[in-house]
Amino acid sequence: MGIVCSILTTTLAFANNAQFIAKDHIVIDLQSGVEWLRCSVGQRWDGAQCVGEIVKLNQEMSIQAIKLANEQLGGNWRLPTREELENIVCQECSRPKIDASIFPNTPAEPFWTGEQNQYSPRHIWSVNFFTGHTYGRFMPFQDLVIRLVRDR
């Protein structure tokens, strides 16, 4: 498993709602004060879009992916909180429920958060970009898509 982000050119993109500023493989979330990897784990930024095969991981494997991202990209990458991931949902967008100009080629599927469901501690919260809704029903051994985030 490898996480690769290629930076070919410096480009800036601004979302219509001015919540996000995208620069190469990083997206700055002005509302949450965090930086997102523009691509899902398994994909890489080619200067114009996210390319490659998305890798679905369970919670244990996501720890290894985070270590690898920190080695390759530097910084303190992590799984997002439920609230952070909910903040990038675009309810006005068609499926996937995310701004594709900022987060291209995002699958319309559930994404892991790093947050345990306090009402059902065996489950982890996820945000589904097919529906735009949050669910606290996935078990840690299930494989879901992940997008990494770090504090600014």
Language model segments and positions:
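Glycine-aromatic-enriched surface loops/turns that form tight recognition elements
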Residues: 2-78, 82-152
